Amino acid sequence: MDQQVDTNAAIWQSNDIVGTWAAEAAARERNHGAQWLFMADLLPFADQQAFTFADLGAGTGNLSRAILERHPRSAAILADFSDQMIGAGEREMQPFAGRYSYVKFDLSTSEWPAAIPAKVDAIVTSLCVHHLSDERKQGLFRGIFEHLVPGGWSVNYDPVRPTDPVVRSVWQRVGDRYDPEMARKRLHPTPEERARHDNHVRHMIPLTQQLEYLRAAGFEGIDVYWKRLEWVVYGGCRPADAAA
């Protein structure tokens, strides 16, 4: 690992860690692929309908590829702050050349890059919002709302933190059964795995808090569309009659 610290920059701008992340692609697809396809189905577009979506914190593009495959006339803008992730993603996105572009965007700031249009049809996120502070989560949801066309949808797939210690123990017990390797990493982590875990849980918050952030931003149709233990797919839409 390039640095023995666990900030977002040290983790996700590390050549070593991003290399490990890329090498884990098959396991990531096995663990999360069904949810990415489900998110593609949640977007309210016909199979042959043309639309543009932004994928924030896109990493190497797993979610974008699921949407692009499901909706063959869609176009993706993938946003990430890590040159290393973008480099790996460019290689993985090649089957969709001409239908996507990458843009650099640090979600810890409120400044949206000009390469993301003022209005897009949908905005999705996967495995990234939990890395942001509460203040930035709220700010990001407001920014997403502002960048959606009226009727546009936002869908997020992310882990959440339980508020009840009994629930926490159940999640951990069942999660260990589903994925023994994750149990091993928690109980006997390498220095890199410990840094990634600390980074993973630092800003994780309960689901109800995030749904309130969506309501405060102005979304409607808010729901938890899928859930298994700490993993959730939730979202909402900008009202169709909202001023552009």
Regions inferred by a protein language model and the residue ranges of each:
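Core SAM-dependent methyltransferase catalytic element
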Residues: E220-A244
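A short glycine-rich, Lys/Arg-flanked "PGG" loop and its adjoining helix->strand segment in the class I
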Residues: Q138-P150
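Short conserved loop adjoining the S-adenosyl-L-methionine
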Residues: T109-P117
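C-terminal alpha-helical "lid/dimerization" subdomain adjacent to the S-adenosyl-L-methionine
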Residues: Y157-A217
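A conserved beta-strand element that flanks and buttresses the S-adenosyl-L-methionine
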Residues: V124
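Conserved class I S-adenosyl-L-methionine
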Residues: M1-D47
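Short catalytic micro-motifs in class I SAM-dependent methyltransferases
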Residues: L127-C128
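Class I SAM-dependent methyltransferase SAM/SAH-binding core
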Residues: A54-L56, T60-S110
